Amino acid sequence: MVSERKTPYPAFNFTVNFNAAEIFGGFSDVSGIMTELTVAEYREGTDPENHVRKAQGIHKVGDVTLKRGVIDSETMWDWMQQARTQGPAAKKDVVITMLDEKREPVQKWTIRGAFPLKLTGPTLAGKGGGDLATEEVVLSCEAVDFGELGA
C-alpha cells in the first residue's frame, strides 16, 4: 500500500535541466509554470435559455522565469543569440524536477519548445552589501507537461 504524503514538499529543492543543451549553473528561482484553457462563449439565436454557453477553447501556457547566480558561462547569452538568429532551431525542452528532503524526485514539469524571450543581466552596485550577482531569463514555450517521474 502506497501512503500519500500529508505535508507539502519544500520549494527549495529542485533541478533544472535543458535537453540537448549545456546550460550550467544552479538556478535559485523558478516561477510561472502555468497552463490554462481559454473559454469560448456562444449563444444560439434560437436558444430559449437567455444565457451564454461556454466551451473549452485554446490551451495556453505562461512564460517561465528562471534566475541564477552569474557564473563563468556564456551559454544563456549564446542561447539568446541563437533564438535571434536561428528561429525555431533554437527551441529546447526544459525539465524542472522538484525533489523531496532526501533529494529524491517527486514531481516533474517538462517545458516544451522553450526559447529565451528576455535575458536580464545582474544589477551591480558599488556600495556593496553582500548581494550576489544574478541573471534572469524568461522563457516562452509551446506546452507544459506534468509528467510521471519514470516517463
Regions found by a protein language model. Name each.
Residues 1-151:
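Glycine-rich, low-complexity intrinsically disordered segments
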